[in-house]
Amino acid sequence: MNLKEKLLSDMKEAMKSKDSLKLGTIRSVIAAVKNQEIDLRKDLDEEDVLTIVSREVKKRKEAASLYKKGKRPELEDKEIQEMKILQTYLPEQISEEDLRQRIQEVIEETGAEGMKDFGKIMKTLVPEFKGKADNALIKELASEFLN
């Protein structure tokens, strides 16, 4: 069962169990997938759907932080719950320790020295950890090693 089919079956399950939060969250992702399919005029593959789910998780995370700054805990909680629902569809996230180790390996492999080689490292790391680690975290750790 691919990710798109899993989203559809989980949506049906949420309808049956009357879980309105999960239902609304999954519907928004399915809508984003369909909009992307319409824009590109083709069916999306697994990787594209995964990218959309990652984008939706990132949106929820940003919204939660804005609600926190605005002292709106009830809306922040809702965004966090939606984010947790969506994270179940993402591959298991890599630990920061493993990510640090891999960044160190890539730096040694490419012979990177300083921030001038930052692009080389990111070009290798981002596709490798797509969906498994946040790009902002990869960027932060890579720049930490290069400085």
Predicted feature descriptions by range:
Residues M1-N147:
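Charged, compositionally biased, marginally structured helical/coil segments
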